């Protein structure tokens, strides 16, 4: 028999009754019923119940052991009997009569329990992450991640893509996020950077003559944590394709996402094909560029209705209406509750009216609406008896942010929100440029390296604020999974694009010398995308925080509490690297912006 096990703890069934077996695992739980010990033994594969009778050698050993001790147990498979079957366990029809027990790894008192998923402080969990990962939910999440990545690889190869590796040590990037830098011992005073993404390398692979590239790429960015963003490092499905237009990129990625979320979605519906929603339309209808389409409500821009109005709360402001059917009969606390929610998002309040059976509008602002206002709103919003309408007014960005949140919350409270579904969409037609409201200067709105939709002609002839870019996002349930773009591979078009944003040609030539040199030696049209693996798994696992899908994440302050990183280097190490440390000083943001201050081309915004 094998030194440690003949079977796993998730393997034995009723057909194995009478078999002598050897199991190894962790003591998950124990119960003492009249001197008879019942032990749940757990390994990676499952749980098997052990029984140790009073007076046996096995009972003498097991009685002294604490939870999470690692043991090897020899015994015989016996039936539990019909009345004692545990239907929640695949091994629930049998148990092991323990005959011999060997302690393989003793466990000291635990900092928290493993066999329950009670609320333990996240910092504590991260400090003892190896214990946290023994918990069923966390173990399941990490195994889901493993299966998802394996499936992605298989599907990408089937779609004709080739997996290629790109460097981890590279040059510092002029793009928006901060780099993690690595000193070079062999080149004193010089530094490598860990890649924010393989962006330039994957484009160079296309220029090298390869056609369909992918990798599960580690990316490193020194940025703050969010619920859907882990500080330090993350992984993305990095993709690039040659001789493609926008729809050529959409086709394989949409197929991949549909198959992947169908495979791992536990029966949740996956909506396909994915709708294409222009950026401007998304901002007006949903209040943001990552709409949660499970909310079956849409905002309506009614700014023009109140132009010149005497109603000061709306006059001269951007005004958005949210019609909600079948809510007029809701009690006042329903309306007040949504108002409180809007205030939590930064609003001063939330105006509303409801439509009675006679079609008349009632509510706090009804008296301020003229007959013409009521007529236009009824027609434009499709109002009918039972409807309620919520209003937001303010600066465009402000009212968009607030009403996007109100839209989703109202849908949830009014029964207009779909459960158990993955609703994907593509956001397209991003503006190439935007105006800084304070300085009046034109700058890139998102990705400075994408191709303008009209090429050089649009750059030379159109108002910059009217130029659209071949940029796109893929969004699922309000989570942005990735940005992507058709790349600007023509040097003169790129220089012109940067010129419009106020960058001198020699600055661009200096900062992007390597890419421009490659573009001038025969570059094909190419484009790509990079969906975040962590966010994909977060959605599939239905977890609210991305750190729940990563085996060993940093905490919100970019610290590894388990390994004690970052650490202080000894003076000898610093000397070897020719590094002298200075005391930290408070710094102010530099007046001059870096070149291409926008986020990385395929970064989730």
For each predicted feature, which ranges?
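Class II aminoacyl-tRNA synthetase catalytic cores and aaRS-like
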Residues: 1-605
